[in-house]
A protein has these predicted regions:
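Beta-alpha junction/loop-to-helix N-cap segments that form part of ligand/metal-binding clefts
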Residues: 27, 42-49, 61-108
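Short, well-ordered amphipathic alpha-helical segments that serve as non-catalytic structural scaffolds
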Residues: 50-57
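Bacterial N-terminal signal peptides that target proteins for export
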Residues: 1-8
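Acidic/histidine-rich, surface-exposed loop or edge segments in extracytoplasmic proteins
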Residues: 31-39
Length: 108
């Protein structure tokens, strides 16, 4: 019974959120804030390239017409730089943000 209630609630939420989903022909920009320079550059760059390859593969196979673009922004593994990188991501039109390395930048 509890499962059925949760399933109905989830369906109602998804049905009412139709305007929040990307439409055909739209590009969804996702900012990847991670160190792309300095000590952790190799890790951050590798993760960025992985996300970009996944997005490119999805874009080729995606029948819905929605495209995904991963924008890499260097946060230098610094909380202060992360807030600047977040502003830059918003200026570039990113609607979603993800971050990989470091709890300090993640909390910023």
């Amino acid at each position: 019974m509890k499962f059925a209630i949760k399933a109905v609630a989830a369906s109602v939420i998804l049905a009412s959120a139709g305007g929040a989903f990307a439409q055909k022909g739209e590009t969804v920009k996702i900012a990847w804030l991670d160190p792309l320079s300095g000590l952790m550059a190799a890790v951050g760059t590798n993760q960025l390239k992985t996300y970009q390859l996944i997005a490119e593969d999805f874009n080729r196979k995606n029948a819905s017409g929605v495209k995904f673009e991963i924008i890499g922004i260097d946060n230098k593994l610094s909380p202060q730089e992360t807030t600047s990188a977040l502003r830059s991501a918003m200026d570039q039109g990113a609607r979603y943000v993800t971050q990989g390395n470091g709890s300090g930048p993640a909390l910023a």
